[in-house]
């Protein structure tokens, strides 16, 4: 395996691991960034205080300790407002951090992988024994990538303008084989098909909600 293929495989594996672990991202972010933030600490403190006051209200009688019960209710109303405001701030803070992490992923993974594919997209992963092993159109796409199909209409238009005959030339390519771009496309297609079959075999079927029967009238007709 060449270093070009090895780097491409590393990019694919890292991106797939991030995709498969999406459900755990919130837990990781919470433990790393959100749990010890000042807003989160204050939010948890207020929630515990509200829970304590609610338990205290349940343990006392509203008739025997009306003043205490009323004072606690006022505290609860104030705490509810503060908790709502802090919850909105915490949500905005979380979304801001997630946005920064998406930018980091874009700069460290997505953009470098795209640049790498543009740079080494025509790198031959598998060599073909000879030029005529497959149809010229297929061989051209495999060795030059999907851009080869986009260039064909331009070559056809050029041949019409110049009056020369149009032919798909593949013998002039320095190397004939499967390029890195096509190989990555095939690899991702195989992975997607495996994911689809796995989901079909092991995913739990979604049951339809049962219909509720309601009695809309109590009339009884007698023939």
Curated annotation (Swiss-Prot):
Give the record's family classification. Belongs to the WRB/GET1 family.
Taken from the record's topology, the Cytoplasmic segments are: 22-105, 195-223
Alphabetically list the UniProt keywords. Coiled coil, Endoplasmic reticulum, ER-Golgi transport, Golgi apparatus, Membrane, Transmembrane, Transmembrane helix, Transport
Subunit structure, as described in the record: Component of the Golgi to ER traffic (GET) complex, which is composed of GET1, GET2 and GET3. Within the complex, GET1 and GET2 form a heterotetramer which is stabilized by phosphatidylinositol binding and which binds to the GET3 homodimer.
Q: Where does this polypeptide localize?
A: Endoplasmic reticulum membrane; Golgi apparatus membrane
Chain ranges sitting on the Lumenal side read 1, 127-177
GO MF entry, a single one: protein-membrane adaptor activity
What GO biological process term is on the record, naming one? retrograde vesicle-mediated transport, Golgi to endoplasmic reticulum
Topology with respect to the bilayer: Multi-pass membrane protein
Q: List the disulfide bonds.
A: none
Q: What is its main location?
A: endoplasmic reticulum
Q: Which domain of life is it from?
A: Eukaryota
- Per the UniProt record, which residue ranges are transmembrane? 2-21, 106-126, 178-194
What cellular component terms from Gene Ontology apply here?
endoplasmic reticulum membrane; GET complex; Golgi membrane
Instruction: Quote any Pfam family the record assigns.
Output: CHD5
Q: What is this protein called?
A: Golgi to ER traffic protein 1
The answer on whether this UniProt entry bears the keyword Plastid reads no
Function recorded in the entry: Required for the post-translational delivery of tail-anchored (TA) proteins to the endoplasmic reticulum. Together with GET2, acts as a membrane receptor for soluble GET3, which recognizes and selectively binds the transmembrane domain of TA proteins in the cytosol. The GET complex cooperates with the HDEL receptor ERD2 to mediate the ATP-dependent retrieval of resident ER proteins that contain a C-terminal H-D-E-L retention signal from the Golgi to the ER.
Query: Which stretches are annotated as coiled coil?
Result: 56-105
């Amino acid at each position: 395996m060449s270093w070009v293929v090895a780097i491409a495989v590393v990019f694919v594996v890292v991106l797939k691991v991030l995709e498969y672990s999406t459900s755990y991202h919130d837990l990781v972010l919470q433990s790393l960034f959100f749990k010890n933030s000042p807003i989160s600490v204050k939010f948890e403190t207020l929630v515990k205080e509200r829970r304590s006051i609610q338990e205290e209200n349940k343990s006392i009688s509203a008739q025997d300790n009306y003043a205490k019960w009323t004072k606690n209710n006022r505290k609860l109303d104030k705490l509810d407002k503060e908790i709502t405001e802090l919850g909105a701030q915490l949500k905005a803070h979380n979304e801001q951090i997630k946005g920064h992490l998406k930018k980091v992923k874009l700069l460290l993974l997505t953009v470098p992988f795209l640049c790498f594919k543009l740079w080494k997209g025509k790198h031959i992963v598998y060599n073909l024994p000879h030029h005529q092993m497959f149809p010229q159109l297929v061989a051209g796409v495999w060795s030059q990538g999907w851009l080869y199909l986009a260039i064909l209409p331009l070559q056809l238009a050029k041949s019409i303008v110049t009056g020369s005959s149009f032919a798909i030339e593949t013998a002039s390519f320095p190397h004939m084989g499967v390029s890195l771009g096509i190989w990555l496309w095939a690899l991702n297609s195989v992975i997607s098909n495996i994911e689809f079959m796995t989901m079909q075999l092991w995913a739990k079927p979604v049951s339809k909600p049962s219909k509720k029967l309601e009695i809309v009238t109590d009339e009884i007709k007698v023939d």
